[in-house]
Amino acid sequence: MNMAESHLDPSKLATGPAGAGAATGQRPLAPLNAKIEVKNLNFFYNQFHALKNINLSIPEGKVTAFIGPSGCGKSTLLRTFNKMYALYPEQRAEGEIVMDGENLLQSKLDISLLRARIGMVFQKPTPFPMSIYDNIAFGVKMFERLTRSEMDDRVEWALTKAALWNEVKDKLSQSGYGLSGGQQQRLCIARGIAIRPEVLLLDEPCSALDPISTGRIEELIAELKSDYTVVIVTHNMQQAARCSDYTAYMYLGELIEFGETEKIFIKPARKETEDYITGRFG
């Protein structure tokens, strides 16, 4: 890409189903099957303006990756989707995050129900201090009344979906703390999908794992997109290229470019994106 390409007509900067509205000043085109639509989103930590006029559409049934240097706002953006910031009164979001026609930022929305619809897995594995079985059953009991047989089936289903069942089926009564780091992360994924969310958020799920465990998580992500809309934050650009269908590049709280992952990595529309991907920046 030559220097002239960084000064293209803004209307031609979209590289996929949604362009970089923050970079062009225009509302990106929404994909026909958008699961989540972010409209003019701004986020503040007290007076610090962390996200600036983000416009973005998350395609349904796909894996979308957020990439960018540390502090660019990618994890902050991810956590607005299920209102993780609601625990902290000094943090606030303005704008719209729309899913199924409903603005998720509305204060009257039940937080527990929202987080049942939009599950989340964090950077560090966080098993509950209880048995493997109860780690899975705990969240389910909050939203459904199942018989013991039905719960057994749900636990097996979730652990199977997370590619963990065969490794733990004979020790379900044992503590989740006894599992390896990679197994604990898959347990957390199983716990997240056990309540059957529509969207699964993954905040750097492999950063604390060894290469073998990372490979298994990446394989799992590829399988999960057949049932869920997946959004992943990663510092690992190779991981984004391997796992995602769409990629958003962020810098200093702004969305610089968004599009199909292959196009973002092979022929980005913005020079800033190219500089980051090729290692000349960040």
Swiss-Prot record:
Pfam families: ABC_tran. It comes from the Bacteria. The keyword Transport applies. Residues 1-24 are annotated as: Disordered. ATP binds at residues 68-75. It is a peripheral membrane protein. GO terms for biological process: phosphate ion transmembrane transport. Residues 36-277 form the ABC transporter domain. It is an enzyme of class 7 (translocase). InterPro entries: AAA+_ATPase, ABC_transporter-like_ATP-bd, ABC_transporter-like_CS, P-loop_NTPase, PstB-like. Keywords: ATP-binding, Cell inner membrane, Cell membrane, Membrane, Nucleotide-binding, Phosphate transport, Translocase, Transport. GO terms for cellular component: plasma membrane. The keyword ATP-binding applies. It is found in: Cell inner membrane. It catalyses: phosphate(out) + ATP + H2O = ADP + 2 phosphate(in) + H(+). Its EC number is 7.3.2.1. Residues 1-10 have a biased composition (Basic and acidic residues). GO terms for molecular function: ATP binding; ATP hydrolysis activity; ATPase-coupled phosphate ion transmembrane transporter activity. CDD domains: ABC_PstB_phosphate_transporter. Residues 14-24 have a biased composition (Low complexity). Part of the ABC transporter complex PstSACB involved in phosphate import. Responsible for energy coupling to the transport system. The complex is composed of two ATP-binding proteins (PstB), two transmembrane proteins (PstC and PstA) and a solute-binding protein (PstS). Belongs to the ABC transporter superfamily. Phosphate importer (TC 3.A.1.7) family. This is Phosphate import ATP-binding protein PstB.
